[in-house]
């Protein structure tokens, strides 16, 4: 047993070293505070070689076999549990073929090169002031939703279409070929099949049984919504630069004073604290503002995964997450609070994994993407709840958002609930078809035609408002061929919400939710499957019906539910929240600059952040009253 124990402790120590080295360089290069792309590629390679090492896999199997001859005890059971975690990680990532190992090294190099070139690419559009400006993906998306000028919106979409061409002209299809070769060298049909097997422990056929069923269940609602939009706004309503504006642009603008960017941090802290969410002593670093060269999509990564070490001492997490907001842009406050809840949900999950090895609490395979995204998307789903909006969304005078505006929002967005989910669904339909193409068929025009065909079939429009090849997830091997995880997660989110509503009658500021999530979803990490965690909390296996039912609700049904939540919240005697803070050390940074921290208190940090935003973005200072 001593030999097995020594191996286990060595794996924990060595993994922490290679994981942290990779994640520290990931953060610095993605945040544009370092240009050491070669160093990151080397660290990524070292990490990949560790998790795909056949010798380590053989050693773990040998150690587990030796433990079978040891008498039962709590110590043996704990050690066996930890080694099985390592077994799952190595079996999930093993690369037995020399050819595949060489291809993996080549993939890391070419993806690093594409990332470095993408960081230097500047996109431009016409902003609300009528000026041409450099724009991040977040700014382009927000402009498409909120800018009342059609020509300005079209400039944002043109930039996204230009990005598609840039991606194709800068080696993406060579990466697709190499990914397929890597997968085939290991016996898989293509890279999409490889990723689904590795990440979700499903076959492609099993995945599309779920996705095809959801597509069929929501098709009529989507077709009806597109028809009604055209009837209401004319033939140009579904043009890609008009679609999101016609769906929610005016309502987003009307909500803007109630969801100011500067108050987003305070609202995140207060809401999570009242839910009973604790970060168990983690160190959090948040980089929230757009910056030239910074990666243009929110993410959450943990350089130090949580676990109990060999002395049963708690190793608290070190977690970074990011947004890329332009605080004085209309709609930026809503996007920022969504990112804080989403990435903050990821951070809460990974800060609360309480197993005995870091392999259980890292975000890559065998951790299911659907499982990980369930945690973040559950948290950001609260932002659409009418009782959350009434308690937290307030303007500069301290007035809550009026019921009439909440109703107007529902009238505007509920008919397009199916379209919103199909906006996720279209990505796996495209990626599966992309990786099924032969190497010879992978040319720019064929792939662009494939993208447009998928958008036409799934979204019901000739071109999507977010063109498929402009989605950053497709470029990175960790997130490529994984986007279906968001839809599977949202199905689990609505199943989870239904459970809490049955059990407690409400979600917003319910202090029972954080502890329940921590116990059933977070603590096990990847030692349980996604389905097992759902059964543990809700008592039923994975069930897609809750999301489909939500998409198919009428406006009247959605408003009746919202009104009931508002009425109940107004008279509810909320129980006390379990703690006065999030039990985390938090730093808000802008590159190398520290904007605020909670050395004194969470309240002081939020006030310091709000003050910094007011000084640097005075136009954003609306709706900043305390609630």
Language-model features: where?
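N-terminal helix-rich structural modules
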Residues: 1-166, 441, 477-481, 582-627
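Post-HEXXH active-site segment of zinc metalloproteases
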Residues: 193, 332-340, 347-378
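Active-site-proximal, well-structured secondary-structure segments within enzyme catalytic domains
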Residues: 128, 132-139, 146, 173-324, ...
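Post-HExxH zinc-binding segment in Zn-dependent metallohydrolases
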Residues: 211-220, 365-403
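C-terminal, non-catalytic "cap/extension" segments appended to globular domains
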Residues: 1-4, 88, 340, 348-349, ...
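Alpha-helical recognition segments enriched in aromatics with Gly/Pro capping
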Residues: 311-318, 338-339, 343-355, 389-394
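Amphipathic, heptad-repeat-like alpha-helical segments
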Residues: 167-171
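Short pre-active-site segment immediately N-terminal to the catalytic Zn-binding motif
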Residues: 259-260, 320-341
């Amino acid at each position: 047993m001593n030999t097995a124990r020594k191996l286990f402790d060595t794996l924990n120590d060595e993994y922490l070293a290679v994981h942290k080295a990779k994640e520290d360089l990931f953060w610095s290069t993605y945040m544009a505070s370092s240009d050491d792309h070669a160093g990151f590629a080397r660290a990524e390679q070292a990490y990949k070689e560790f998790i795909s090492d056949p010798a380590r896999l053989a050693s773990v199997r040998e150690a587990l076999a030796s433990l079978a001859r040891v008498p039962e005890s709590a110590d043996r059971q704990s050690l066996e549990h930890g080694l099985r975690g390592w077994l799952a990680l190595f079996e999930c990532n093993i690369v037995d073929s020399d050819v595949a190992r060489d291809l993996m090294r080549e993939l890391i190099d070419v993806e690093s090169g594409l990332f470095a070139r993408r960081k230097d690419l500047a996109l431009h559009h016409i902003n609300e002031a009528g000026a041409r400006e450099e724009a991040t993906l977040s700014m382009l998306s927000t402009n498409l939703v909120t800018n009342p000028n059609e020509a300005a919106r079209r400039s944002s979409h043109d930039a996204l279409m230009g990005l598609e061409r840039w991606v194709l002209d800068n080696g993406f299809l060579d990466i697709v070929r190499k990914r397929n070769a890597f997968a085939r060298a290991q016996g898989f049909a293509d890279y999409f099949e490889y990723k689904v097997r590795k990440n979700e422990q499903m076959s492609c056929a099993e995945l599309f049984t779920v996705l095809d069923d959801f597509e069929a269940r929501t098709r009529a609602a989507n077709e009806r919504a597109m028809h009604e939009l055209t009837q209401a706004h004319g033939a140009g309503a579904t043009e890609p630069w008009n679609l999101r504006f016609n769906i929610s642009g005016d309502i987003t603008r009307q909500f803007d004073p109630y969801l100011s960017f500067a108050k987003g941090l305070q609202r995140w802290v207060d809401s999570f604290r009242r839910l009973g969410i604790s970060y168990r002593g983690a160190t959090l670093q948040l980089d929230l503002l757009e910056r030239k060269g910074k990666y243009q999509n929110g993410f959450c990564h943990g350089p130090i995964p949580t676990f109990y070490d060999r002395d049963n001492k708690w190793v608290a997490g070190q977690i970074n997450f990011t947004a890329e907001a332009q605080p004085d842009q209309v709609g930026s406050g809503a996007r920022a609070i969504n990112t804080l809840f989403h990435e903050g949900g990821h951070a809460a999950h990974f800060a609360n994994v309480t197993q005995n090895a870091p392999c259980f609490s890292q975000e890559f395979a065998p951790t299911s993407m659907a499982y990980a995204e369930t945690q973040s998307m559950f948290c950001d789903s609260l932002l659409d709840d009418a009782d959350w909006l009434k308690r937290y969304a307030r303007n500069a005078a301290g007035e809550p958002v009026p019921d009439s505006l909440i109703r107007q929002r529902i009238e505007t967005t509920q008919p397009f609930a199916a379209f919103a989910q199909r906006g996720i669904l279209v990505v796996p339909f495209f990626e599966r078809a992309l990786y099924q193409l032969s190497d010879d068929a992978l040319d720019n025009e064929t792939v662009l035609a494939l993208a447009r065909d998928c958008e036409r079939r799934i979204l019901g429009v000739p071109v999507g408002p977010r063109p498929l090849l402009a989605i950053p997830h497709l470029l990175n091997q960790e997130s490529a061929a994984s986007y279906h995880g968001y839809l599977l997660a949202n199905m689990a989110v609505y199943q989870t919400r239904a459970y809490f509503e049955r059990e407690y009658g409400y979600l917003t500021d319910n202090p029972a939710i954080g502890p329940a999530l921590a116990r059933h979803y977070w603590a096990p990490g990847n030692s349980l499957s996604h389905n097992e965690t759902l059964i543990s909390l809700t008592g039923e296996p994975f069930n897609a019906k809750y999301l489909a039912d939500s998409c198919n609700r009428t406006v009247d049904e959605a408003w009746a539910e919202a009104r009931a939540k508002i009425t109940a919240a107004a008279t509810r005697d909320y129980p006390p929240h379990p703690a006065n803070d999030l039990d985390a050390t938090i730093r808000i940074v802008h590159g190398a600059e520290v904007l605020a921290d909670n050395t004194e208190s969470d309240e002081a940090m939020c006030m310091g952040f709000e003050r910094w935003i007011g000084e640097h973005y005075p136009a954003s200072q609306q709706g900043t009253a305390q609630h």
